[in-house]
Curated annotation (Swiss-Prot):
Chief location category: secreted
Range of residues in the leader sequence: 1-37
Key words, A-Z: Calcium, Hydrolase, Lipid degradation, Lipid metabolism, Metal-binding, Secreted, Signal, Zymogen
Domain of life: Bacteria
Ranges for region Disordered: 34-267
Family: Belongs to the AB hydrolase superfamily. Lipase family.
EC annotation from Swiss-Prot or TrEMBL: 3.1.1.3
Broad EC category: hydrolase
Biased amino acid composition, Basic and acidic residues: 73-82, 226-238, 258-267
Organism: Staphylococcus aureus (strain N315)
Composition bias type Polar residues, residue spans: 34-72, 83-115, 125-172, 186-207
Binding locations of Ca(2+): 580, 645, 648, 653, 656
Name this protein carries in UniProt: Lipase 2
Length: 691
């Protein structure tokens, strides 16, 4: 009987040892399969990895449960057979099984520790790509879930086949997993990166992924066993931007906009505006795109074919004729128009004409500023109004100015009227001067003889009172204001002053040997105090109407106007100046805004909108800012610029922080663009005629 019991105990021990061996072999096969899977395919997105991090814990717990049950069974057998001499063999086998199980467990932990460390490093570099791969992530999540189910089924089938596995097979050591270089394709809502160092294999890999959306990936991430501390480490690495973060290569598009009040930001905006593509095409801007580049040392030819001459308005002083504290007329300190355009390679000039003189005198001075020579106001004109016939001498910016050699003329405020009158004299002459010359003989200026067509390519006016301004009628041309203006000219005409306000032809300049008292007495007898030959009168409604009747449209010239408005309608229907309008124009804005005619009320502080659009007796057409303004023989009226007062066009309001230098840069480069299109249109027409 004792022998039968020992045989049964031996059979039980043998059976238990077999069960333990089978379980150990099963664990070895599973761990080997997991190690191989982790070597083949690292994780590709955050969502799939999160699911992977959760599932290995469940499988690890299942393995640990099997180990605990096996150990418990073996302990029970030890207690039951502790006194038997044959237990030694069972203990040896048990220790071998435990050692192998422990070794397999260490292998699993080693593999997963390495995997967690590598995944943590990889997560940071792939964070921005993961954010851009939402669609791919959802598809891959489905694939991961299907694969996990397949793996569980495979593990169960492996258990039934584990009896054929060699028990002496050594466990495979953990191997280093190479970093994953797969990149997720950016979605349509993410701007493309300008980084030239991005991997070139991205498109090929994305194409492979998108080619078979329903095909399961056989290289799924390995199961991992991590604790809470390791999981926190992974999440922290996901939140920190890494070197490969795309957001660092998009020039701050994801960052809030920086204020542009600082000079550095404003200068950068101006630089960007100046470096925008310039076009010379009439209909297809893209075909004739042209980038603005500064003139090189050996570059003589400017970007524009015809010189651009900017003509200032009433009270304007430019260049050496401007006092020390007088602001830069063209652009102020916001954007120095002449200087910046010259840096970009354009041939531009700022004319210096009378600040207080009439449009007639200013037009004559403008001609000699371009052509060069001593100013000749005309014998008939000098005799009629009672001032000197000759004025100062100009060097000239274009001594060979003649028909066929053209200029572009851009005038601000009264400057727009001045250039219109000069072009009229060039083309049709001055009838009074021609008649006086026939009657009295002598010399006559070429400006007054007429017949000088094709010398002006375009005329552009900025906030010009083509039809006059009520501010001049009710304020500027009043006797009190005129006396103040002429008194200022009288004072600045002293022998120690180098500032010329433009009334020297009226005697407003102290002679070298003349005392100041004698100078005052002489000037007080000048006819200017009662004359209409001055700016104050020419800016009135009546003075502007006379100019409109004197001038005509040239069918060969491109005409363009720009207009601003800086007033709003009050509760009583009148126009009041907007907040931010230049403070010196508050009174004039209210004078215009309370005009009896409603259509004359809206204004830019000095000029009514209706007056700036175009001369009332000449044809016009409304154009957009995008279409090429190249029509000739008709006024092309640009859209009204909301919020721009009279001096915003030239940027001299240093108290207006809303108007930036970049805004002026865009405005004037837009004008230059139109002038280049005019030249391109003319060249195209010449080629067609030649063919």
């Amino acid at each position: 009987m004792l022998r039968g019991q020992e045989e049964r105990k031996y059979s039980i021990r043998k059976y238990s040892i077999g069960v333990v061996s089978v379980l150990a072999a099963t664990m070895f096969v599973v761990s080997s399969h997991e190690a191989q899977a982790s070597e083949k395919t690292p994780t590709s997105n955050a969502a799939a990895q999160k699911e992977t991090l959760n599932q290995p814990g469940e499988q690890g717990n299942a393995i640990t449960s099997h180990q605990m049950q096996s150990g418990k069974q073996l302990d029970d057998m030890h207690k039951e057979n502790g006194k038997s001499g044959t237990v030694t063999e069972g203990k040896d086998t048990l220790q071998s099984s435990k050692h192998q199980s422990t070794q397999n467990s260490k292998t699993i932990r080693t593999q997963n520790d390495n995997q967690v460390k590598q995944d943590s490093e990889r997560q940071g570099s792939k964070q921005s790509h993961q954010n851009n791969a939402t669609n791919n992530t959802e598809r891959q999540n489905d694939q991961v879930q299907n694969t996990h189910h397949a793996e569980r089924n495979g593990s169960q089938s492996t258990t039934s086949q584990s009896n054929d596995v060699d028990k002496s097979q050594p466990s495979i050591p953990a191997q280093k997993v190479l970093p994953n270089h797969d990149k997720a394709a950016p979605t349509s809502t993410t701007p493309p990166s300008n980084d030239k160092t991005a991997p070139k294999s991205t498109k090929a890999q994305d194409a492979t992924t998108d080619k078979h959306p329903n095909q399961q990936d056989t290289h799924q991430p390995a199961h991992q066993i991590i604790d809470a501390k390791q999981d926190d480490t992974v999440r922290q690495s996901e939140q920190k931007p890494q070197v490969g973060d795309l957001s660092k290569h998009i020039d701050g598009q994801n960052s809030p906009e920086k204020p542009t009040d600082k000079n550095t930001d404003n200068k950068q905006l101006i630089k960007d505006a100046l470096q925008a593509p310039k076009t010379r095409s009439t209909t297809n801007a893209a075909a004739d795109a042209k980038k603005v580049r500064p003139l090189k040392a050996n570059q003589v030819q400017p970007l524009n074919k015809y010189p651009v001459v900017f003509v200032h308005g009433f009270l304007g002083l430019v260049g050496d004729n401007a006092p020390a504290l007088y602001p830069n007329y063209w652009g102020g300190n916001k954007f120095k128009v002449i200087e910046e355009l010259r840096k970009q390679g354009y041939n531009v000039h700022q004319a210096s004409v009378s600040a207080f003189g009439s449009n007639y005198d200013r037009a004559v001075e403008l001609y000699y500023y371009i052509k060069g020579g001593r100013v000749d106001y005309g014998a008939a004109h000098a005799a009629k109004y009672g001032h000197e016939r000759y004025g100062k001498t100009y060097k000239g910016i274009m001594p060979n100015w003649e028909p066929g050699k053209k200029v572009h003329l851009v005038g601000h405020s009264m400057g727009g009227q001045t250039i219109r009158l000069m072009e009229e004299f060039l083309r049709n002459g001055n009838k009074e001067e021609i008649a006086y010359h026939k009657a009295h003989g002598g010399e006559i200026s070429p400006l007054f003889t007429g017949g000088h067509n094709n010398m002006v390519a375009s005329i552009t006016t900025l906030a010009t009172p083509h039809n006059g301004s009520q501010a001049a009628d009710k304020f500027g041309n009043t006797e009190a204001v005129r006396k103040i203006m002429f008194a200022l000219n009288r004072f600045m005409g002293n022998k120690y002053s180098n500032i010329d306000l433009g009334l020297t032809q009226w005697g407003f300049k102290q002679l070298p040997n003349e005392s100041y008292i004698d100078y005052i007495k002489r000037v007080s007898k000048s006819k200017i105090w009662t004359s209409d030959d001055n700016a104050a009168y020419d800016l009135t409604l009546d003075g502007s109407a006379k100019l409109n009747n004197m001038t005509s449209m040239n069918p060969n010239i491109t005409y363009t106007t720009y207009t601003g408005v800086s007033s709003h309608t009050g509760p009583l229907g009148y126009e009041n100046p907007d907040l931010g309008t230049f403070f010196l124009m508050d009174t004039t804005s209210r004078i215009i805004g309370h005009d009896a005619r409603e259509e004359w009320r809206k204004n830019d502080g000095v000029v009514p909108v209706i007056s700036s659009l175009h001369p009332s007796n000449q044809p016009f057409i409304n154009v957009t800012n995008d279409e090429p303004a190249t029509r000739r023989g008709i006024w092309q009226v640009k859209p009204i610029i909301q919020g721009w007062d009279h001096v915003d066009f030239i940027g001299v309001d240093f108290l207006d922080f809303k108007r930036k230098g970049a805004e002026l840069a865009n405005f004037y480069t837009g004008i230059i663009n139109d002038l280049l299109r005019v030249e391109a249109t003319e060249s195209k027409g010449t080629q067609l005629k030649a063919s």
